[in-house]
Structure formats: structure tokens, C-alpha cells
Amino acid sequence: MRLMNFAVLAIGLGACTGAPEPPDRIAYLAIGGSDAAGVGADPLTDGYVFRIAEELDEQVDEVSLTPLAIPRADTGQLDAAVELLLETGIEPDLVTVWTGANDVIEGEDVDDFEDELEDLFARLRERTDGVIVAANIPDLTELPRFREDPDDDVTRERIEAFNDAIEEQAADYDVLLVDLSDEPVEDELVSDEDGFHPNDKGHQRIAEEFLEVILPALGLEPEA
């Protein structure tokens, strides 16, 4: 696997019918916050993005990974970073997007979030007709961090509204959806250090959820 650490900033289809033809090469762009950088995993390269790339590498001759991972970034900041990255001429075959949690925590208005997400999806879709996969937001209120110290901005009602926005924009831009909203938030999947980020097991679970959507979309075999 050829790894392009272009943007891990320390601050981080085939035919219209039937299965798509499996690719020989995949240019993979992973967009997200600290989770996409592997925070919570030990080492960071055991994070969910890298686990996805490793599984792809088992089935494809060449996988080039460009992680655009910016800790604490909201969706507007990620969109701005994607705009700059796309100016380099990158043409991804696969894009994963996991954003929204930071927007919820920061108290952003859901309509503003949806506008920013639409800009992001539109920008990506303008560049690639490849596979774009986005995850929604799990129930943050069940994380140890927010059980112990509740936040008025982190409510089930707001999370549901943000997830509705993600679902609507994903449908509009032919983005496949990974539904994490119904996944139980188990303490054994969460880092003991901050009660927020996924630990090794959590990153593995997230990778598995993404791969359930990614592999068939690329015409690849399910995980063994």
C-alpha cells in the first residue's frame, strides 16, 4: 500500500446493473476529524481509516491513501481543506467522510451544518464519479464524557436533526450512508483516556461498518 500523508494534520462504478467490476487500483481519500487520524487507537495507524485501507490492500493491487484528518475540525473547516486539496488535482476513486460530531458539540445550527455538508458533497461529486461513503453520528449522549458531564448542545434531539441532514444530503449527491446512529455506544469501545474517542476495538468496529458498505460498492469480496 502506498500511503500519502498529504493531510494528516497534527493540529491532523461499473455497470448500471449487476455488481461493479473490481478495480485494480484505488485512490482513497479519507475525510474527517481526529477519529480519521486514528486518535484513540494505539498506534494511530490502527485507526479505522488505516484498517479500511489495509482491507482494500488485501484485495487490490495498489491502494494509495490520502487521509485528510483535522482534529477538532467542523464541517465548514473540512470543506475548506477539501477545496485546497482538490486543487492539487487529486482524483479519488473512493472517499469516506465522517463529520458532524464536532458541529454538534460546538453548538452549530443544524441548517448551517447542512449547508456546509452540501457544499462538501457537491465539491467531491464534481471531482469524482467514484464511490463516496459517509457515516452519520452515533448517540454521543451515551459516551462516558457526556454521561459524566452533560452538555446542553449534545442532545438526542440535535443528533437526530443532524443525522436527518446527513441522510438528505447523502441522497442528493449519491453518497452511500453508514448508519452508526443505531449502533450501541459501549464503554468497551471507547478510550479510557478521554471517554470520547474510539479505542482499538472501537476503531475496528467503525472500520467494519464502513467496509460493509464500501466493499460491495467496489465489487470486492466481504471481509473474511
Model-based region annotation:
Residues L13-A15:
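C-terminal motif of bacterial Sec signal peptides marking the signal peptidase cleavage site
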Residues M1-L9:
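Sec-dependent signal peptide recognition
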Residues A69-A73, T99-G100:
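Cell-envelope and extracellular/periplasmic
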Residues A81-E223:
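Alpha-helical cap/lid subdomain in secreted, periplasmic
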Residues T17-P71, L84-T88:
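Serine-esterase "nucleophile elbow" of acetyl-processing enzymes
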